[in-house]
Amino acid sequence: MASPPRGVLMSLFVLPLLALLINCCHKNLATSIRTSIIKLPGSDGSRSDAADTYCESWRLAVETNNAGAWDVLPSSCVDSVARYFNGDQYGSDYYVIVDYALAFAKTVKISGDGKDVWIFDIDETLLTNIGYYRAHGYGVSRSEPFDSKSFNEWVVQGTAPAFAASLRMYNALKKLGFTIILLTGRDEDQRSFTEANLRDVGYSGWERLILRGPDDQGKSATNYKLEQRSKLIDQGFKIHGNTGDQWSDLLGFAVADRSFKVPNPMHYIP
């Protein structure tokens, strides 16, 4: 009987070896792919083990408006938000924003006609109501919904402190020659308490304090504020800057050349 050709013998030896190598490589590649997949915090149901990480991510989402309109502060994040406000990070975040705002303000050429405007919101922008919110669950939560009656009672007291960073920014803008206009969602019948509170903590020299009148009741904050900004522009004012803690302070028509949102993860006002 004749011996098999040498090529056949080589095939019988090489093919099984090649199959073995392919199988090993496939397993190694699969293992490599599996180990390179990154699991996001909470994606495997372990969010409770990474609550702080989740809450910091949630806070970033709401501050950047990626969350859009949101309802309430997640109950799992109340402690995290409390630590944020009571620790150093909140103040640090605020001062960084103020530094950027003032850097921009210094690039503006002031005309000297009194029409170069910077707009400020009041609550959680110039004045902090953290004393009230600290006593009421740090904002709106399902366990303790917002109570407008008790908040208005707080406003009437006129004891809200100033943000040190905002006061610094406010006074620096005045020195640069900006006309300051205050645009708030507070009602007209709160004017005297609001003016007294602002002056008591160091604010002065604003051109106008605009509050909600009877015709503004029921309007969303966004619509109310864009209407007021439009009126200012119609009167010849140039809105260079705008600072507020809510996106509704800043968005819509007649926006500023630059808007600066200061942090507030306690509540959302549409």
For every predicted segment, state its role.
Residues 2-120:
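Non-catalytic pre-domain segments flanking phosphatase-related domains
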Residues 69, 74-77, 91, 111-117, ...:
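Active-site neighborhood of HAD-like aspartate-dependent phosphohydrolases
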Residues 93-96, 100, 153, 161, ...:
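Extracytoplasmic/secreted proteins, especially bacterial periplasmic and envelope-associated proteins
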Residues 113-116, 174-181, 204-208, 236-240, ...:
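Loop/turn elements at helix/coil->beta-strand transitions in domains of secreted/extracellular proteins
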Residues 124-125, 157, 166-199, 208-212:
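Substrate-recognition element of Asp-dependent hydrolases with the DxDx(T/V) motif
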Residues 125-127, 133-134, 175-180, 185-190, ...:
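Solvent-exposed loop/turn segments at secondary-structure junctions
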Residues 188-240:
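Substrate-recognition "cap/lid" segment bordering the active-site pocket of phosphatases
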Residues 226-229, 233-270:
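Acidic, Mg2+-coordinating phosphoryl-transfer loop and its flanking beta/alpha structural elements
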